Regions:
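Short loop/turn elements that flank and shape the SAM/SAH-binding pocket of Class I
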Residues: 1-4, 83-85
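Active-site-proximal beta-strand/loop segments in catalytic clefts of secreted hydrolases
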Residues: 18-20, 50-53, 80-82, 110-113
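Loop/turn elements at helix/coil->beta-strand transitions in domains of secreted/extracellular proteins
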Residues: 11-14, 43-46, 73-75, 102
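Surface-exposed alpha-helical interface segments used for non-catalytic interactions
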Residues: 31-34, 62, 95, 123, ...
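Structural microenvironment flanking redox-active thiols in thiol-disulfide oxidoreductases
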Residues: 27-71, 81-88
Length: 136
């Protein structure tokens, strides 16, 4: 698959999530990202993972591909070896998910585990996505 750009995804709601496969907190969100992909892929929502490595193993595209397959993550994933995307988004922590509307504007984000200690980040993002899908 060729690299994706937000420009190519105009007209769709895009969920961009930054993570590292060896990040414990990131693991807690994988099931939610997988659910979102399955739930919304036919409705104009694209989930994109950006693996920003902390360790040498996380820099290896084959290891990233294997880890994604093991976790049944079937959405597009890129390896941000030089942290260029991390820096461009001014991201500060793993995991973080950004919600981009159909026009390419950042509308919502969540940093950390979506459901850490009773938080309802997944529900907040889901409500935001539903609202964006309802917009013309």
């Amino acid at each position: 698959m060729l690299p994706l750009t937000l420009k190519e995804l105009r007209g769709k709601v895009v969920l961009v999530h930054f993570y590292a496969f060896q990040c414990h907190n990131c693991h807690a969100n994988f099931e939610i990202y997988r659910r979102w992909h399955e739930q919304w892929r036919e409705k104009g929502v694209v989930v994109v993972g950006i693996q920003t490595p902390e360790t040498s193993q996380e820099r290896d595209p084959a290891a990233v591909k294997s880890a994604a397959a093991e976790r049944k993550l079937e959405f597009p994933i890129m390896v941000d070896v030089a942290s260029k995307n991390w820096d461009a988004w001014e991201n500060t922590m793993w995991p973080t998910v950004y919600v981009v509307d159909k026009n390419g504007y950042l509308r919502q984000w969540w940093q950390g585990e979506l459901n850490w200690k009773g938080a309802t980040g997944d529900k907040s993002i889901e409500q935001g996505v539903a609202q964006l899908l309802a917009e013309p």
